[in-house]
């Protein structure tokens, strides 16, 4: 009976992973050949929050630099952080780390510890040695070693603020996307849910000291976008789903102007989100019209938010459907495989020519989700519209770990699809290059 049950389980597992066979089955050794092809690719990194090397080398130079990339969120989620004032940092986090190191974030941290510093695990016996090796490595040239030599990255796209200023010196290697949140949200303070013109003024005074009307505000936005383009940005980014729903309605200029004028007339009054949402929606449409005007793509955060405690339903990509219709000439690049809304994302990218998929961050959120949905994306969406790698982290150690996991996601997905006869080995190697490099170059019109 036990043997029968095992055979039944095996047959069910095979059925789950089986695909329609289109091509001849591969020749022996194809797994290794695909592995080698994937790891030979020079990557394009489509989404990072990296500080400059100078800033990084003046910051944390111990094992905690591995936790700058979301690991703290999982340790907080474990509800096991000690937070004992008299304890050492390791004593405070060790129990939570032991629980959280099983997650994708934890695995990425361990990959970095192993591959960059030759430490197999982070525990009570190794954390001091790991810190010593990290400190010894943090010297000029470290970014080149980790990003270009170890991770084999040819270009990194970083996020910059609404002033489009970047601290990275190597402008040929680091490209930038400019945040648009503040223009729509009327504030850079995304943890606030009331709005005043007085605080909005703090934001827009960066670009113009003479904003009194909605027309002035719109002119300020255009000026800021032109300034960003002049500084070399290659696109824009929106992630206001951390603070509100992505659902927007088309609002008349007249109604938006009424709200704007009320805020100007009573600048210290705190307006609720419900009161200002129509104005915010109008301004989001303005952002998209500027993307269209200047021929720039926009990345939009979809799916899981970082930090602890969020409204995940604010991030469902289907909430953006009306803007895909409204702005058919704007290239929308939807981020993070929309975890956990992968099916919805696939349907949108299949239906709309202007909707693209970027799995950035997803391989370290959940590797199995990324493998599963990459397969689904390849079966439903034209392959030129999918990009896989973006670390979405603030330290190069995190970028390295994410790069390895992104390669593994691509490798495991393609090996499974070749094994079943859906793709040939040759098709898989071509696709790997598209997923990890060529598609990103075309999506962002990169010049290497």
Segments the model singles out, each with a brief description of its role:
Residues 25, 319-322, 329-448:
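H/E-rich (His + Asp/Glu) clusters that bind or coordinate divalent metals
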Residues 39, 59-172, 178, 199-202, ...:
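Alpha-helical scaffold segments that flank or form the walls of functional sites
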Residues 32-39, 166-168, 218-236, 282-293, ...:
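Short amphipathic alpha-helices and their capping/turn segments at secondary-structure boundaries
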Residues 19-44, 66-115, 130-132, 383-385, ...:
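Mid-to-C-terminal alpha-helical segments outside catalytic/metal-binding sites
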Residues 10-13:
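N-terminal signal peptide c-region/cleavage motif recognized by signal peptidases
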Residues 42-43, 154-157, 173-177, 233-237, ...:
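Structural preference for beta-strand elements that scaffold enzyme active sites
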Residues 216-217, 231-344:
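Divalent metal-binding pocket/active-site signature
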Residues 168-170, 187-191, 248-250, 309-324, ...:
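Distinct, well-ordered alpha-helical segments
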